């Protein structure tokens, strides 16, 4: 197939009704397609149209707030009786207990905080078991841990998930359309990160079906893009002209037999060409791969499997596994501002590498063949690096090689 073709990729798993397990036949490559872990391949746009066709006209696509009459607690007596009966059936309790639950746990029992009341302070004389457990846990944490990573991560994740919930755009033109698809995309650590190569996403994003693949590509944050090339021991004050992302702009996504290459800039290269040529040599059994331009395709144009590992490659050899774990219609409680998507909702918290000397500040420099360092390589913060390796006039002391260091915890 000609490189950079615009044809919409086919979904062999759908059109051909291919068995997801036996599809590889006698091929000599690992069997990844496990039906209990991922779905069959399907076309995202067609799936969305089928979904919208089922719901259209029923009011289920509306992004407006539900009317007061549709809220819990605003129904009539007959509706309340039916609700009590359903609760009694689900909880295997009596109708009287269900009615008591409705009375005790109803929306009318929710109250605002009084002036000067701090929701973070747990009352001393609480009778609630859950609050008691939480209080003992927090007291133990304060007694035993000075800097609590778990607590910081817990608060951070909550803030990431909640900061955009229900947010509406100031400009009505940026409002997400009713029936828009939202995909949950998990980006795992790059393969070259040996320390953090567990099967754990370090970024989870929500993307819209109508967004181009390049919008996801531009929103992925990776420390490889921030690397600074060159050796700076003789010129530590020289500001670098470029970072890696400015110099090496090539990248691709791989989805279902198609490499989507970023060709927005003249200097972009087709990183997939080497892989395709390797695959086609000696008839390795992978079949024909296709190539396309990333900027010409939206997520609605893709064929994907939920739960299946795909690939994002940039900087030549920095490879991230990408897993799409969910696809759904937008809800009125979602962030409705299109300009905020792709929306980062979760990212992994990393320990930063500290300076070898002060052990307080994050490392900014890494040295090799350093006569002043006890190990090779050795990491220094900016202050300790200059105090140890240069005199008061800024002249270099001794022999060493110095490179700017970008810590993976930069995105914390």
From Swiss-Prot:
Chief location of this protein within or outside the cell: nucleus
Keywords from the UniProt entry: DNA-binding, Nucleus, Transcription, Transcription regulation
SS bond partners: none
GO biological process: snRNA transcription by RNA polymerase II; snRNA transcription by RNA polymerase III
Region annotated Disordered, chain positions: 1-22
Keyword Chaperone: no
InterPro entries: snRNA-activating_su3
Subcellular location as annotated: Nucleus
Secretion signal span: none
Annotated GO CC locations: nucleus; snRNA-activating protein complex
GO function terms (MF aspect): bent DNA binding; core promoter sequence-specific DNA binding; RNA polymerase II cis-regulatory region sequence-specific DNA binding; RNA polymerase III type 3 promoter sequence-specific DNA binding
Source superkingdom: Eukaryota
Family as reported in the entry's similarity comment: Belongs to the SNAPC3/SRD2 family.
Subunit details: Part of the SNAPc complex composed of 5 subunits: SNAPC1, SNAPC2, SNAPC3, SNAPC4 and SNAPC5. SNAPC3 interacts with SNAPC1.
Role this protein plays: Part of the SNAPc complex required for the transcription of both RNA polymerase II and III small-nuclear RNA genes. Binds to the proximal sequence element (PSE), a non-TATA-box basal promoter element common to these 2 types of genes. Recruits TBP and BRF2 to the U6 snRNA TATA box.
UniProt-recorded name of the protein: snRNA-activating protein complex subunit 3
Organism the protein comes from: Macaca fascicularis
């Amino acid at each position: 197939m000609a490189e950079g073709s615009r044809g919409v990729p086919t979904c062999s798993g759908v059109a051909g009704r291919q068995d997801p397990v036996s599809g590889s036949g006698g091929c000599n490559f690992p069997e990844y397609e496990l039906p209990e872990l991922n779905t069959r391949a399907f076309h995202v746009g067609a799936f969305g149209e089928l979904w919208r066709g089922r719901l259209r006209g029923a009011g289920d696509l509306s992004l407006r707030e539900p009317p007061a009459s549709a809220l819990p607690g605003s129904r009539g007596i007959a509706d309340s009786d039916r609700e009590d009966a359903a609760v009694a059936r689900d909880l295997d309790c009596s109708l009287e207990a269900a009615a008591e639950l409705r009375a005790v746990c109803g929306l009318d029992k929710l109250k605002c905080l009084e002036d000067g009341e701090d929701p973070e302070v747990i009352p001393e004389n609480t009778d609630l078991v859950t609050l008691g457990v939480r209080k003992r846990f927090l007291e133990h944490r304060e007694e035993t841990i000075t800097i609590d990573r778990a607590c910081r991560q817990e608060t951070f994740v909550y803030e990431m998930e909640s900061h955009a919930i229900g947010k509406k755009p100031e400009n009505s033109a940026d409002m997400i359309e009713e029936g828009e698809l939202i995909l949950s995309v998990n980006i795992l650590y790059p393969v070259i990160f040996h320390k953090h190569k567990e099967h754990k996403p370090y970024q989870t994003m929500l993307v819209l079906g109508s967004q181009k693949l390049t919008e996801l590509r531009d929103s992925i944050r990776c420390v490889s893009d921030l690397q600074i090339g060159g050796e700076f021991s003789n010129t530590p004050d020289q500001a670098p002209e470029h970072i890696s992302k400015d110099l090496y702009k090539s990248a691709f996504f791989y989805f279902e037999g198609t490499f989507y290459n970023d060709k927005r800039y003249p200097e972009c290269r087709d990183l997939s060409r080497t892989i395709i040529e390797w695959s086609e040599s000696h008839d390795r059994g992978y079949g024909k791969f296709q190539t396309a331009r990333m900027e010409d395709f939206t997520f609605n144009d893709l064929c994907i499997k939920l739960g299946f590992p795909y690939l994002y490659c940039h900087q030549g050899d920095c490879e991230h596994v990408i897993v799409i774990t969910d696809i759904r219609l937008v809800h009125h409680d979602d962030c409705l501002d299109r300009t905020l998507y792709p929306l980062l909702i979760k990212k992994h918290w990393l320990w930063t590498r500290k300076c070898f000397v002060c052990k307080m500040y994050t490392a900014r420099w890494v040295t090799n063949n350093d006569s002043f360092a006890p190990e090779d390589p050795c990491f220094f913060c900016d202050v300790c690096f200059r105090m140890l390796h240069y005199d008061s006039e800024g002249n270099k002391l001794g022999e060493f090689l110095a490179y700017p260091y970008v810590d993976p915890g930069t995105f914390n």
